[in-house]
Amino acid sequence: MKSSIFVACFITFIIFHSSQAQTPRENFLNAHNAARRRVGVGPMTWDDGLAAYAQNYANQRADDCGMIHSDGPYGENLAAAFPQLNAAGAVKMWDDEKQWYDYNSNTCAPGKVCGHYTQVVWRKSVRLGCARVRCNSGWVFITCNYDPPGNYIDNVYGDLEEQKPDFDSKLELPN
């Protein structure tokens, strides 16, 4: 009797925890939406077409894990790390660029990059698709695509409502 109660409890535990586990798409989406929520930007939705585009490109990078943009029609962030990188880690790397973003001048600090961060929180980018691949080298490559794309010069980050809701944008991005 005790063993059947134990088995029933164990099965219930497994079912409960497996139902609570997030899928990779939920991990990417939740990490992005948490970063956006912190600065007052609405949530994104997952787009299977963007995810397929991202997966196709990630598969192309599996041989070299090269941090080379796809030059596609979408906004895009790339990340790579060894030996592990997950959705939360990639989005954290991009979100951490916030420290170098100056709201008053609407620019990145000299010599720093913040374009990944601005793409994550770009208000008009409302659809997201991401993919992850383990490269032949053992590194992990992640790409996220955004639609509509963000980071347009003269309109970069200009509609974010954290400190300056109605300011003109003049963010200078590195070439």
UniProtKB/Swiss-Prot annotation:
Q: Which residues form the SCP domain?
A: 29-146
- Fetch the InterPro entries from UniProt: Allrgn_V5/Tpx1_CS, CAP_dom, CAP_sf, CRISP-related, V5_allergen-like
User: Where does the record locate the signal sequence feature?
Assistant: 1-21
Q: Which Pfam families match?
A: CAP
Which CDD domains does this chain map to?
CAP_PR-1 (cd05381)
Q: Report the domain of life of the source organism.
A: Eukaryota
Induction trigger = Synthesized during pathogen infection or other stress-related responses.
A single Gene Ontology biological process assigned to it is: sexual reproduction
Instruction: Identify the keywords attached in UniProt to this record, alphabetized.
Output: Disulfide bond, Pathogenesis-related protein, Plant defense, Signal
Record's keyword annotation contains Transmembrane helix: no
Gene3D superfamilies, A to Z: CAP (3.40.33.10)
Q: Which SUPFAM superfamilies match?
A: PR-1-like
| Cellular component, GO annotation | extracellular space
Q: Which cysteines are joined by disulfide bonds?
A: C65-C135, C108-C114, C130-C144
- Give the PANTHER family listed for this entry: CYSTEINE-RICH SECRETORY PROTEIN-RELATED (PTHR10334)
> Family assignment?
Belongs to the CRISP family.
* Job of this protein: Probably involved in the defense reaction of plants against pathogens.
Q: What is this protein called?
A: Pathogenesis-related protein 1A1
